[in-house]
Design a protein with these regions (language model features):
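Vicinal oxygen chelate
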Residues: 1-26, 36-58, 70-71
Length: 71
């Protein structure tokens, strides 16, 4: 099972640019330590925020994907 959350930017003033990195996909994982270890091994972690308990990985095209703990 998974849940995909989409955001509708109704009043966004210009055409959506996938390269903005301001808007991104977020995935929740049941085991943050296990996911972090895997992503660290793959070398795809591009930003970490330990205070918030999240981190970001970069896909092959350079787009960021947020990894958050399952709640």
């Amino acid at each position: 099972d998974f849940r995909l959350e989409l955001t509708w930017l109704r009043d966004h003033p210009q055409k959506y640019d996938l390269g903005e990195c301001e808007f991104h996909l977020a995935l929740s994982v049941p085991d943050m330590d296990k996911a972090h270890a895997l992503h660290e091994k793959l070398g795809c972690i591009c930003y970490e925020n330990p205070a918030m308990g999240i981190y970001f990985i970069s896909d092959p095209d350079g787009y960021w994907i947020e990894i958050v703990p399952e709640r």
